[in-house]
UniProtKB/Swiss-Prot annotation:
Zinc finger residue ranges, C2HC/C3H-type: 7-36, 110-139
A Pfam family it matches: zf-C2HC_2
Domain of life of the source: Eukaryota
Lineage: Eukaryota, Metazoa, Chordata, Craniata, Vertebrata
Annotated GO MF terms: zinc ion binding
PROSITE patterns in alphabetical order: ZF_C2HC_C3H (PS52027)
Polar residues biased stretches: 208-226
Cofactor: Zn(2+)
Feature: compositional bias, Basic and acidic residues: 40-50
Organism, scientific name: Xenopus laevis (African clawed frog)
Protein name: Zinc finger C2HC domain-containing protein 1A
Amino acid sequence: MEETEEELRPCKICGRTFFPATLKKHVPICQKTSVKKRKTFESSRQRAEGTDINTVKPVKPRPEPPKKQSNWKRKHEEFIATIRSAKGISQILKEGGELPPPPPPSYDPDYVQCPYCQRRFNQNAADRHINFCKEQSARMGQKIKGGTDPKRKPTVRPQYKPPSLKTDSPAAVSSPASRLPQPPNFGKPTSGIPSGKSVANSGAPGNKYQTQSPAHKNSTMVTSPQAGGALKARTPPSLVKNPSSGTSFNKRKTYNAENNARPEAAMGYDSSDYSKPLNDGHIRAADNNMSGQLTKFCHECGTKYPVEWAKFCCECGVRRMVL
């Protein structure tokens, strides 16, 4: 083994060891390779030889973009400052002090600012946006020079308005009594206690109750002693004019036996009071100083007056009628 090691000799160019016979062949080849660089072998060209396939040009490798320096330290400091400011604001809100001014906005230095709209974009987005923003700003400038303001709102088209409803003339305005809320059994013939308003034949004076105001009713329905004498209480005018007719009366509100018993028991009235005349059938009206007889039931809604000296109905508010 020692003899073989002594026989090996190193090459002066590459430093490798060879036998003396092999070294003589290696030295001239090593000198050529050191002077002239070896070409890279392209297997694609070798496979394409003898065929119709065109030799593809080798793709040049793209230069690697320079690596950006990481700004992790600056981002870390901004994050810590944001957390501290949030804690300070929460403490001030608990104590009730004045809020400090907001911190200045932080910008990413890697972003590119647009010279037209002053916004910031990534490098790839900025390359597309700046060209578009440049053309848009040029168009807007031409519109302003032409006299059109882009910020001005467009003119609004006139909207169609429907015609207003026709109002009734003062002569056709209904009386206050007709505007009052009516009970559900309004206009239905019922049987029960007779009301002050009676149903008369067509052409009779009793039809004036539905077309005239309460004040006009009082002036037209007062009977004088010379004309026919005062009627007794609770005697309907229709029975006096037509004693043979047994028709039911048109009332605003129906009463049953239970409803009639409650107000009498509460107010202390007796059923015998309905047939007795009040002050011999004559009382003096407080407002117009005319002698007449007061009704015990409202001629509008049929509600019984709770007291003898009531001037208005407690349900519908219509003035009490004097017969």
